[in-house]
Amino acid sequence: MINTIVVGTDGSTHGQNAVTWTAELARQLGARVVLVHVAPPLGPPIVGAGGYVMYVPQDVVDQTSADLQERVITEFCEPLRAAGLAWESRVQQGSAPIVLADVATGVGAQLIVVGTRGQHAFGELLHGSTSHGLTLQTELPVVVVPHGAHVTQRSTLGAKAQG
């Protein structure tokens, strides 16, 4: 049975569609949702042209992280609030497939949900997609939600039968 679902979002339209889809599914299953936004690392040194090393000051890192957490809670989590679900949100830095798989394992999730394509299309070209990377990082089922998809009663029954 699916009790906990991890949904990854980057704030794009596709990511928000995955959150809305997850909210519909979780409402029908009575599952809790852990929304995860994975941000690129801000803190390590950056080597610039000519070998110059630049650092992002810690206060800038802290403020940026706090602002992002607030945006995640106020904007990205709205479908979860509207559905009346038990949910939590997390903002973590790192590689999206690794972070999502680690969070899913840590919270005991039975399912991971992501959108089809987010804001990092150029990064996907260089490093591979989040959804593909997830399939290499976890043994959990990964649902890739196409833009505009909706949960139907039929898909919910299928999800319950697999549990």
Indicate where each model-derived feature is located.
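Glycine-rich, Arg-bearing micro-motifs that act as flexible, cationic patches
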Residues: 111-137, 151-155
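Conserved beta-strand positions in the Rossmann-like core of class I SAM-dependent methyltransferases
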Residues: 34, 88, 143
